[in-house]
UniProtKB/Swiss-Prot annotation:
One term under GO cellular component: cytosol
Free-text remark on how the cofactor is bound: Binds 1 zinc ion per subunit.
EC number(s) on file: 6.1.1.3
Domain TGS per the UniProt entry, residue ranges: 1-61
Alphabetical keyword list: Aminoacyl-tRNA synthetase, ATP-binding, Cytoplasm, Ligase, Metal-binding, Nucleotide-binding, Protein biosynthesis, RNA-binding, tRNA-binding, Zinc
Catalysed conversion reaction: tRNA(Thr) + L-threonine + ATP = L-threonyl-tRNA(Thr) + AMP + diphosphate + H(+)
UniProt name for this protein: Threonine--tRNA ligase
Pfam families on file: HGTP_anticodon, TGS, tRNA-synt_2b, tRNA_SAD
Top-level taxon: Bacteria
UniProt subunit comment: Homodimer.
InterPro entries, per the entry: aa-tRNA-synt_IIb (IPR002314), aa-tRNA-synth_II (IPR006195), aa-tRNA-synth_II/BPL/LPL (IPR045864), Anticodon-bd (IPR004154), Anticodon-bd_dom_sf (IPR036621), Beta-grasp_dom_sf (IPR012675), TGS (IPR004095), TGS-like (IPR012676)
Function per UniProt: Catalyzes the attachment of threonine to tRNA(Thr) in a two-step reaction: L-threonine is first activated by ATP to form Thr-AMP and then transferred to the acceptor end of tRNA(Thr). Also edits incorrectly charged L-seryl-tRNA(Thr).
Ranges where the record places region Catalytic: 242-533
């Protein structure tokens, strides 16, 4: 006779085992109709699963994030149902939930066309209208193998055969279509109303370029048509803000086939990069970091000692010379330990903070490369802090302050924080994990910050905090991190002399704020739609004359501003002033100076902004003061 405890603390007693749906029915027909799944003692389950003992139960509906995830997962299976009806020879692979949607990987001889996508979506809508029940059946591995063997589904068979023999498998049945999944899924297709298929792309089976190329159908699903429309609107805006598109308009950078995943920085894009780098350099110096530089090509033996060779060999670019094998560094940390290891260190020397703008290369799959957001060659704002166990909390606390200081400078006030704790497989004693996790959580709590706990999501060598930015479209970008490492310093022989004159291994804190310069610049371009804050703008001022008579004055003004290190360009083309103003506005130049005969005679300059605000005429020194004020605002000038 289970006693069910509800989220509000109320309890309900049942005379026999009860399903989640029956609990919902006991609370009212409206809730039962809306029920999609349930959490039983924190575990997300199908509504048909019986509850046999006292439990805490939360009914999940489309208003909950868990409900939306369940709906999206069910839509992935609905793709399978529709595709198998329309294209019986198709073979189904996998169909997981992703951010804002879902996809299904399918093997089919003919490429799916836009018309095929329309037909699949139409068939899905027809199936939804049937309001049929989605039934779940728990089977053994052998039974699942036979089921998919009967259906001639080789990809499903491959997955089934890799599942441990004693593990249960759930089969979900959509009428004549059967799929497998951990679940949960909606109990009836009446919950599957608001969706849209988005596109088709290629994807290798299991991400292995040596395996079959499949077709991936992407879709999105939401709890209401209003949410779907808002999402599609955001996508439309995101397309306008695509950093690759804006980079082409502004001549910031380009990529090309001869160097996949490598950036060709143009002068204007490189100007943004240099401002960013110098700002981080100066800020780190104020926070007592030492800037260092380490080799890019390092002997294989160091990567073997650090453990990277075993775990990341396939992601490394390697080369040989004089019968020695080298790797181009995919990360900086082992090299930073080498610098720490030079000379005897005392506890009095700690903490030591080593920072590097380290150029790294990783052999990312070509299909995953995406402008600045996913590259092979990137530069990290990387630093490593070597400290004692007792110093961890203080160093984390200082880093949190630094993170928020820098993010605010770029106009990001919404920062999401996650703390990842010990996984099952790990190094280090429970005692040191307890201390480290407490140090991280206490540092966050002392700042009064809200954060989410991710149990078991830490690396094997230590817990970590992740910092994610929310941009103007509500998209979340994970950028900053601080990671405790108990393993690498010991593996690479790092030590210091403690107060008791004994050798101790320091704790190593891996930390980054931007993540990589390339990706962060991509985020900034999209966040600001290319209209960078004045301090970051590749060209801060464009000077233009109305007639050829004003050319010399324009050049003089440009020289004066350039001498003061403002990024200035002069436009002396024989074009109408309206054309020039429009062109530099489209180039997102923050300030436009216009000089005609009137300004030339008065010694003043006419000033307007890219947003169209007209300041009228003013002395050049007054404009410089205006420019300085705008630069000092940094990211606080807002997003337009």
């Amino acid at each position: 006779m289970p006693i069910i405890t509800l989220p509000d603390g109320n309890k309900k007693k049942f005379d026999q085992p009860v399903t989640i749906m029956e609990v919902a029915e006991s609370l009212g027909p409206g809730l039962a109709k809306a029920a999609i799944a349930g959490r039983v003692n924190g575990v997300l389950l199908d509504t048909c699963i019986p509850i046999e003992k006292d439990s805490e139960v939360n009914i999940i509906t489309a208003k909950d994030q868990d409900g939306i995830e369940t709906i999206r997962h069910s839509f992935a299976h609905l793709i399978g149902h529709a595709v198998k009806q329309l294209y019986p020879e198709a073979k189904m692979a996998i169909g997981p939930v992703i951010e804002d949607g879902f996809y299904y990987d399918i093997a089919y001889d003919q490429p799916f066309t836009p018309k095929d996508l329309e037909a699949i979506e139409a068939r899905m809508k027809e199936l939804v209208k049937l309001d049929y029940d989605v039934n779940v059946e728990i089977v053994s591995r052998e039974e699942a193998h036979k089921e998919f063997e009967k259906r001639c589904e080789p990809y499903k068979i491959e997955i089934v055969d890799e599942i441990p023999e004693n593990e249960i498998i759930k089969l979900y049945r959509h009428q004549e279509y059967t799929d497998m999944c951990r679940g949960p899924h909606v109990p009836n297709t009446r919950h599957l109303r608001t969706f849209k298929l988005m596109k088709v792309s290629g994807a290798y089976w299991r991400g292995d370029s040596n395996k079959t190329m499949l077709q991936r159908i992407y879709g999105t699903a939401w709890g209401s048509s209003k949410e779907l429309k808002a999402y599609l609107k955001r996508l439309e805006e995101a397309e306008k803000r695509d950093h690759r598109r804006i980079a082409k308009q502004m001549s910031l950078f380009h990529t090309q086939e001869e160097a996949p995943g490598m950036i060709f920085w143009h002068a204007k894009g490189w100007a943004i990069y240099q401002v960013l780098e110098q700002y981080i350099r100066e800020t780190l110096s104020l926070h007592a970091y030492q800037e260092i530089r380490t080799p890019q090509v390092v002997d294989r033996s160091l990567w073997e000692k650090s453990g990277h060779w075993e775990k990341f060999k396939d992601d490394m670019f390697t080369t040989t010379s004089e019968n020695r094998e080298y790797a181009i560094k995919p990360m900086n940390c082992p090299c930073h330990v080498q610098i720490f290891n030079q000379g005897l260190k005392s506890y009095r020397d700690l903490p030591i903070r080593l920072a590097e703008f380290g150029s790294c290369l990783r052999n990312e799959p070509s299909g995953s490369l995406h402008g600045l957001m996913r590259v092979r060659n990137f530069v990290q704002d990387d630093a490593h802090i070597f400290c004692t166990e007792l110093q961890v909390q203080e160093e984390v606390s200082k880093f949190i302050d630094l993170v928020f200081e820098i993010y605010r400078s770029f106009g990001f006030d919404s920062v999401l924080i996650k703390l990842s704790t010990r996984p099952e497989k790990r190094v280090g004693s429970d005692e040191i994990w307890d201390k480290s996790e407490k140090a991280l959580s206490d540092a966050l709590d002392a700042k009064g910050l809200a954060w989410d706990l991710l149990p078991g999501e830490g690396a094997f060598y230590g817990p970590k905090i992740e910092f994610s930015l929310k941009d103007c479209l509500g998209r979340v970008w994970q950028c900053g991190t601080i990671q405790v490492d108990f393993s690498m310093p010991e593996r690479l022989g790092a030590s210091y002399v403690a107060e008791d004159s004994q050798r101790r291994t320091p704790v190593m804190l891996h930390r980054a704020i931007l993540g990589s310069f390339e990706r962060f610049i991509g985020i900034l371009i999209e966040h600001y739609a290319g209209r960078m804050p004045v301090w970051l703008a590749p060209v801060q001022v464009a000077v233009m004359g109305i007639t050829d008579r004003n050319a010399q004055t324009c050049q003089d003004v440009c020289k004066k501003l350039s001498a003061l290190e403002y990024r200035t360009e002069v436009d002396l083309r024989n074009e109408k002033i309206g054309f020039k103003v429009r062109e530099h506005t489209l180039q997102r130049v923050p300030f436009l100076i216009i000089i005609g005969d009137k300004e030339q005679q008065s010694g003043e300059v006419a000033v307007r902004t890219r947003e169209g605000k007209d300041f009228g005429s003013m002395p050049l020194n007054s404009f410089i003061s205006l420019l300085d004020e705008a630069i000092a605002l940094k990211g606080r000038s807002g997003v337009s």
